[in-house]
Amino acid sequence: MIGTYGHGTENDFVLVFDPDNKFEISATQVQAICDRKTGIGSDGFIRIAKQDGKWFMDYRNSDGSIAEMCGNGIRVMAKYLIERGHQLPGIFPINTRDGMKFLSVPESGDITVNMGQIREVFGEITATTNGHTWTGYNIDMGNPHAVVFVEDLDQVGDLLTSPIVEPADEYPDGVNVEFVQFLDNGELKMRVHERGVGETKSCGTGTCAVALAAALFKSTRLPASWIINPPGGLLSVEIDAHSNAILTGPAVLKEDFDLSKYL
């Protein structure tokens, strides 16, 4: 079995092409592949499959858990399909556990994905880490996000452990936590702790959650657009008048690996 390593703003993945849906993988095998010391090393694993004749992204976190959606991962998957000759450039759908997403993929350059409608789940949340507690926004991207705004991201600390988010019963399967600082140039600097992974260089669904939270925080009328600056590189997010998030950013494929020793 051949796996391909790729990333979107340094949020990295191992991809396997399985259009006939013959490949079954366990959580333990995903963990082995994604392990940065003994495996290939990545934030997540993507099985490129088909469902009802359309492309389907079977996404797993690095701990082997199943995730609904990954905004960086779906761009990297689209890049794979184009570069390996399985799909023509242009606009096409990819199905996910969070529903169908439509992507605009040029022959070269950044890839745009309509992430669908996002919404605030009302009710105050708090996030605590490094001895600090902030109130924040509960955002539903098909997967859960807690977004908090801080004066300085240095206050957040090392994020080696998951922040404590309350009320805990809002997130029975865990939550992605974004910490955001407004920069003088209008960009949003961000760090993220992803459930099932830890701190990552970027999170596509997280940047979309941050964009909506920023509009709420600043009482900005929609449509609105933001440049989000996670450690891995810049992403742009537009929130349209119907609260649909349109995410644009790069996707990179690097090299292929033989995965047989991990399976």
Question: Where are the model-predicted features located?
Answer:
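A glycine-rich beta-to-alpha transition motif near the start of alpha/beta enzyme domains, typified by
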Residues: M1-E107, A146-L263
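Short, solvent-exposed secondary-structure boundary/capping segments
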Residues: G109-G116, I246
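Active-site glycine-rich loop that binds ribose-phosphate moieties when present
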Residues: Q117-G136, D158-L160
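Glycine-rich beta-alpha junction loops
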Residues: Q117-R119, M141-H145, A251
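Internal active-site segments that recognize and position negatively charged phosphoryl groups
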Residues: T128-Q155
